[in-house]
From Swiss-Prot:
The lineage of its organism: Bacteria, Pseudomonadati, Pseudomonadota, Gammaproteobacteria, Pasteurellales. Residues 21-31 have a biased composition (Gly residues). GO terms for molecular function: rRNA binding; structural constituent of ribosome. PANTHER family: 50S RIBOSOMAL PROTEIN L15, LARGE RIBOSOMAL SUBUNIT PROTEIN UL15M. The gene is rplO. It comes from Actinobacillus succinogenes (strain ATCC 55618 / DSM 22257 / CCUG 43843 / 130Z). This is Large ribosomal subunit protein uL15. Keywords: Ribonucleoprotein, Ribosomal protein, RNA-binding, rRNA-binding.
Length: 144
């Protein structure tokens, strides 16, 4: 047996009906589209959300909220990520050099998640109260 000799079982595959090829095919003339109307025409589609001229739902509901652009360039740093930084001084540049955060991140905040055992100095990063307590308990410090 070879791959080029394989074929599906007899009767397993049905050829598709060809539209508009005579009345004997069962799909001649209108080709299964019915008579007249927008959906019978070429390119006859209605756009997403169209409700036949009725005011659509997405316009009936009020607008709300916005997407913060600062959130896109802000990262949360776990305590165990601080150990990946070379040296014991953690800055934004040091985190980028250690590939903890991407190059486009402009702000970072250290959060209380994971564990920290070695003493590190946090410089120029925002720190939550719980994370600050954990860093100081491990013998580290937080500088503004």
């Amino acid at each position: 047996m070879r791959l080029n000799t394989l074929s599906p079982a007899e009767g397993a595959k049905h050829s598709a009906k060809r539209l508009g090829r005579g009345i004997g095919s069962g799909l001649g003339k209108t080709g299964g589209r019915g008579h007249k109307g927008q959906k019978s025409r070429t390119g006859g589609k209605v756009r997403r959300g169209f409700e036949g001229g009725q005011m659509p739902l997405y316009r009936r509901l009020p607008k709300f909220g916005f997407t913060s652009k600062i959130a896109a360039v802000t990262a949360e740093i776990r305590l165990n990520d601080l150990t990946k930084v070379d040296g014991n001084i953690v800055t934004l540049e040091a985190l980028k050099a250690a590939n903890v955060i991407t190059k486009d991140i402009q702000f970072a905040k250290v959060i209380l998640a994971g564990e920290i055992n070695n003493a590190v100095t946090i410089r120029g990063l925002r720190v939550t109260q719980g994370a600050k307590a954990a860093i100081e308990a491990a013998g580290g410090s937080v500088e503004e």
